[in-house]
Amino acid sequence: MPSYSVRPAAPRDAKAIADIHVATWQAAYQGLIPDDVLKAMTVEKRLAYWKEAIEYSDPQILVALDNDKVIGFAGFDRSRDPGTKSSVGEIWALYVTPAHWRKGAGLALWDGARDGLKEEGCTQVTLWVLLANASALAFFEHAAGFKRDMPSLKTTAFGSVRLEELRLKRPVD
């Protein structure tokens, strides 16, 4: 299995992050989210978002590198869920290029995000995942040790389709 390095994202990484965000959504959510929604997701739109996120550290962003090439990213910070304690963090995003799926890059990003959440004083961490995304559920539950936070389903609209998301949680340590 390859070894990946992880570091905080820099402004120069915004384009690579936007490329990865679009490519992974189009690969992972094909058949789950309508094609017109996936096709409307452009690198240009994502680039503006990620430039601002990196500039303001909202959320905090890490990138995974294979040699010197950005091949994945994670965004994390305090939980955005209403009514949660300040000691609860959230993985806002964790995406790796399809060519690097199941090779350890996601775990390297999770480990880096977990360290960042610990530094922020978080003791618990949550994330939301599409209930129909079996691959993501398998990664977070089996590889990263998350458990389903029942009952925590919410419905999110993706174009004309409404999909259920499930919150997962675990201790930071």
Give, region by region, the residue ranges found by the protein language model:
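Structural motif
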Residues: 20, 120, 143-144
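Conserved GNAT acetyl-CoA-binding A-motif
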Residues: 117-128
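Conserved catalytic-core motifs of GNAT/GCN5-like acyltransferases
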Residues: 84, 126-129, 141-164
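Helix-turn-helix
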Residues: 136
